């Protein structure tokens, strides 16, 4: 479920085209272990895809917190 929310949020915000800004949102939200490869894994919905990795809830929360900071 988190992957689906994350993927849709990236699309709505345009951050699917700006991974650096997405990484900044994670860092501002306090999640410092996000990476470009994790972003790719977390936006993958097909669980049979070798890239798929379930997005932890704390990562999604930090991402939203970072987006709020960026929006200020």
Model-based region annotation:
Residues 3-4, 18, 24, 31-56:
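A cross-kingdom feature marking solvent-exposed beta-strand/loop segments within repeated
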Residues 1-15:
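A short, Lys/Arg-rich alpha-helix, primarily the initiator
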Residues 6-9, 19-22, 26, 58-67:
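Short, structured motif recognition centered on aromatic/hydrophobic residues
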Residues 48-72:
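Charged low-complexity interaction tracts in eukaryotic proteins
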């Amino acid at each position: 479920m988190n992957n689906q929310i994350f993927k849709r949020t990236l699309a709505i915000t345009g951050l699917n085209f700006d991974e650096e800004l997405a990484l900044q949102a994670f860092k501002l939200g306090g999640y410092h272990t996000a990476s470009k490869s994790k972003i790719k894994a977390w936006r993958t919905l097909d669980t049979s895809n070798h890239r798929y990795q379930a997005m932890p809830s704390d990562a999604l929360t930090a991402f939203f917190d970072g987006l709020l900071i960026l929006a200020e």
